[in-house]
Amino acid sequence: NTALYPLMGIEVGTTVHFPMTTQELQAALAKIGIDGKRYSEVFFTSFDSDVLGLYDHLYECENIDELNELGHALLEVRDKGGLETFEAALVLGNHTRSVKDLINLTQNLDLYRFYPDISDDEGLGRLYADELGTIDIPEHIQNYFDYEAYGRDVRINEGGVFAPGGYVSAVPEGFKEYYHGPQDIPPEHRIFAYPEKAEPVHSILAALKRFQEAPPAPKKDKAGPSHEER
């Protein structure tokens, strides 16, 4: 709730998950006192995502409907097996300056060449020379060929980068702008609507006070190793 911070010096907020429904959004807005009358503005204090690096490209005043559209677009990318390519494209850094760019990026992933598990110039050189056949190396000099230098030249010429999941580069031309702004969001993905009734501010503040004054929870014994730790 944007208004309560300068007035009272506290952040009154809640966590939401995209994509979401209008009903879920209204419940979240009501919880922090947003009714569209006395209080109507919201901002985001932080982002988190299973999509590696996505939160670095999101900002506090993002449009809620656009974030929801991005959420739906990313689900579609995931279902098509393209999340690693999208994550690598974020590292490449083209078309990542706004949510509008990110939505368009999800629809242009066919322009990106992504090779998983390629993490250095030598590996890239071997991939291009031995597997993709981009250069003919006579058999009698293969043991002396500088794959690292060749891979470096490939990377520089393509403008590619090594991302956490592999190597990525993009076709220089052909990126299309399918999404031009909120007017292009399908009706079923437009969720923003104020709730009919919001939680009174005094109730919110009382709940915060109770939380702040509550004794700390007792420490539990350390649990056994998680699945990831094993």
Task: List each model region and its residues.
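Non-Sec secretion/translocation targeting segments of pathogen effectors
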Residues: 146, 201-230
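Alpha-helix initiation and N-capping motif
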Residues: 22-25, 121-122, 147
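Short, surface-exposed polybasic-aromatic patches that bind anionic ligands, especially phosphate groups
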Residues: 148-157, 161-164, 172, 179-181
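A broad, low-specificity signal marking well-ordered, structured residues that form hydrophobic/aromatic
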Residues: 14, 42, 166, 228
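Mixed-charge (acidic/basic) macromolecular-recognition segments
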Residues: 31-143, 172-201
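N-terminal ordered "arm"
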Residues: 1-38
